[in-house]
Amino acid sequence: MVTRKMDKRLWSLQGMTALVTGAASGIGYAIVEELAGFGAKIHICDISKTLLNQSLSEWENKGFQVSGSVCDVTSHPEREKLMQTVSSIFDGKLNILVNNVGVLRGKPTTEYVADDFTFHISTNLEAAYHFCQLSHPLLKASGYGSIVFLSSVAGVVSLIDCGSIYGLTKGALNQLARNLACEWAKDGIRANAVAPNVVKTAQSQSFLEDVSKKEGLLSRTPLGRVGEPNEVSSLVVFLCLPAASYITGQTICVDGGLTVNGFSYQPHA
């Protein structure tokens, strides 16, 4: 019989540490709120100093243990500096790495230029890959490590409006989660990916304001609506909890049923 004491341990992040990238707004912000609610001590980074300071102030008023750094994740030196800061704050140990930061420039494939490719790869994929490398010794030292990648349904099925480069970066994150789950299991580190459908954030606002695009998306989504940030953050944080200790290498869609709903692509003549 499982005791109440054991139940609390399984559903608590008390005493654990976390790094969440791009977390001053949107889904990242919701992830921080959820992690803090379970007792984690968190460090975040964001490229916007204004948003970072605003969010840190809000969390301080709520009594959350959150610190933050301004960081351009496309910069190799800035990524290294961030991890040095994290190591110093958390005494060389880290339990949770959430690779949340991501960008999207949706275009037809023939219209992409070299800068678009570099922009997506460096932000969505290279940064996440490098953060995993840098955090490995800290995650291993903690004795309980969990990596969560914020992927997308665009990395699972073809979503033309998101663009091919965005889709390939998210698909790569799903595969990276599988590889790390196998390679780093011996070090006590799990890795999973969470793949949301379109979620109500500032980043998705222009898409949702396009009536035809929004209607097209909702017609393929069984639940008939877009997601909320907290509907994604709840799964992200679950994957970090001891209760999820046997889950690794998975890509889990938070999509209102989009990826299991059959639909046909009809190209324009």
Swiss-Prot record:
The active site is at 166 (proton acceptor). InterPro entries: NAD(P)-bd_dom_sf, SDR_fam, TR. Its EC number is 1.1.1.-. Substrate binds at residue 152. Gene3D superfamilies: NAD(P)-binding Rossmann-like Domain (3.40.50.720). Pfam families: adh_short_C2. One of its GO terms (molecular function) is oxidoreductase activity. Keywords: NADP, Oxidoreductase. PANTHER family: 3-OXOACYL-[ACYL-CARRIER-PROTEIN] REDUCTASE, TROPINONE REDUCTASE. This is Tropinone reductase homolog At2g29320. It comes from Arabidopsis thaliana (Mouse-ear cress).
